[in-house]
Amino acid sequence: MSRRGTAEEKTAKSDPIYRNRLVNMLVNRILKHGKKSLAYQIIYRAVKKIQQKTETNPLSVLRQAIRGVTPDIAVKARRVGGSTHQVPIEIGSTQGKALAIRWLLGASRKRPGRNMAFQLSSELVDAAKGSGDAIRKKEETHRMAEANRAFAHFR
């Protein structure tokens, strides 16, 4: 056993304008090549577009979208006796949020549109309503876990 202490889990910092951790998690996932100011610009433009589209609080739309996309359970490949099984595992809240953000960004990148802010705002609004590619991805993951429920004892 290691003599070193266990690493403390870092809490996500909040962004400067909205003081929201989810916004900061989004910024850190959208970030490419260290261009954080560009990532902030994209997020803030998307939030502004959400405000224009829905005429409600954009942060509540963001929260609702992430809550809707967050999976409760996922499958993990586990090799048992020469064959690989997809074993369903429960997901914690932090990991679930991280997955939800990754899926939302992936779905928004695939969307047709002028720029990333427009694509992201459209995907977030759709996810808050309960439609869109990110929601489909969550449902697909839940279906996979349900189909492989017989292998749950391999954990």
UniProtKB/Swiss-Prot annotation:
Identify the Pfam families for this entry.
Ribosomal_S7 (PF00177)
UniProt GO cellular component terms: chloroplast; small ribosomal subunit
Could you tell me one molecular function GO term of this UniProt entry?
Answer: rRNA binding
Keyword Ribonucleoprotein recorded: yes
Q: Name one GO biological process term.
A: translation
UniProt keyword list: Chloroplast, Plastid, Ribonucleoprotein, Ribosomal protein, RNA-binding, rRNA-binding
Q: Where does this protein reside within or beyond the cell?
A: Plastid, Chloroplast
**SUPFAM superfamilies from the UniProt entry:** Ribosomal protein S7
Q: Does the keyword RNA-binding apply?
A: yes
Family from the record: Belongs to the universal ribosomal protein uS7 family.
How does this polypeptide assemble, per the annotation? Answer: Part of the 30S ribosomal subunit.
Briefly state the protein's biological role. Answer: One of the primary rRNA binding proteins, it binds directly to 16S rRNA where it nucleates assembly of the head domain of the 30S subunit.
NCBIfam families for this protein: rpsG_bact (TIGR01029)
What is the official name of this protein in its record? Small ribosomal subunit protein uS7c
Species this protein is from: Coelogyne cristata
Q: Which gene encodes it?
A: rps7
